[in-house]
Amino acid sequence: MKSERPKVLHEICGRPALWYVLKAARAARPTTLAVVVHGAGDQVAEAVRPWGLEPSPTFVEQRELLGTANAVAVAEYAVGRVDDVLVMAGDDPLVTGEHVRELLSVHRRTKAAATILTASLEDPTGYARVVREGHRLVDLVGEDAAEADPEIRSIREVSTLVYAFRRDDLYRALPLVGRDDRSGEHYLFHVLRILKEKAERLSAARIDLGGGMGVNSRSSMARVSRIMRERIIGAHMAGGVTFVDPATAYVDVDVRIGPDTTILPASSLEGSTRIGSGCTIGPATRIRDSVIEDEAEVTFSVLRESRIGPRATIGPYASLRPGTVILEGGKAGTFVEIKASRVGKGSKVPHLSYVGDATIGDEVNVGAGTVTVNYDGFAKHPTVIGDQAHIGSDTMLVAPVKVGKKAWTGAGSVITKDVPAGALAVERGEQRNVPGYDERKRAARAGKDRKQAAGKRSRKRAPRGGRDSG
């Protein structure tokens, strides 16, 4: 991955890869949950704890990278005395709880010593091929042997790194797993061969992973993310949400969207965003950790940690920063930036304005070019605007300042003092009209042009100095 971050903590659709794996593992209703880590164990543990998993995971350190069999071996005491052990790779987020339940169902129904989860890939290069008869696993053929046998090479079904074992069979076989000749590691799938030699029953459960497997590189992470997005968006569409172009929509796993909402192209819904029913989002809109209530519209805009009320209108090209609240029927229009502010019911900030640290009442109109001047170079200060106030275009509201209910400000005013309710505040130089200005201006310009032209003609007639002849 070429990263300082552990591979299992790289995010897929808003959550680390490991989050999906542990979520799937919980479908088995485990009595114990062990996470084997190497190197950045503290970093992984710190990331996992806030997820509030039950049972709480036990973190086991694999001091040397000696392979998957060794990783399972070092977790023996953390696993405890149980009947079955489920083993999953921490970098395979496409495996779901449904897949885990299918694996365990086959494992218990066939009374197998070990059962593997399998999937079909268009390109199975690098994976062990599965040879089976029904649910019975006949053989698991490694990459080198598969390349040597055309019949095996044609098999597309491969082993995932998800296994179910009878505990006692697993931990009796692990000490017998030798080192791989090429890598020097101990591989878990060698346990299957040992169990097969002991005439134990082996089973296989096939699932559909959508053509993806684990995350081993940036390119595989992009492929897995695409498959995950397709799953997420498919679930939303099944719930009554319209995606005009699903291929250009980016929706994180924790996002919730109500029915009859339309998501237009090139929109990104991230984090814990909640969108109500009957909304229109996009195109080219990014919303993170925000709440959009019913029938709101957000167009060509960026929202972070904001709340938008019913039937409110945002954009185009609005930027709503953390702490912004737009109440029912409110508007933040074209090229408007709002931060840590509350805009009341039916109030409008239509265009080209900055509103920061402000409380705006109901049915207020904020004219174009208005700025709440909230920063004095050291601290931020609040602006309060009462209900039904009218803020003239290009008004500078120098905070801290209050504009009363039904008060007005004149266009172009710099308001530095509180404005009483119902009053008009105007702060600008008095307009002076100069009669006949255009005629005098043009006459003066014409005279200047004539004088310049005469000067040019005079210079052309003047004799040029030169060498005497003769």
Where are these regions (language model features)?
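Conserved beta-strand segments of alpha/beta enzyme cores
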Residues: 8, 56-58, 136, 201-203, ...
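Conserved alpha/beta core of the MobA/IspD/sugar-nucleotide pyrophosphorylase nucleotidyltransferase superfamily
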Residues: 156-258
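Long, low-complexity, intrinsically disordered segments
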Residues: 456-470
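Residues that recognize and position ribonucleotide moieties
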Residues: 10, 93, 163, 214, ...
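Conserved N-terminal catalytic core of the sugar/cofactor nucleotidyltransferase
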Residues: 11, 15-109, 446-447, 468
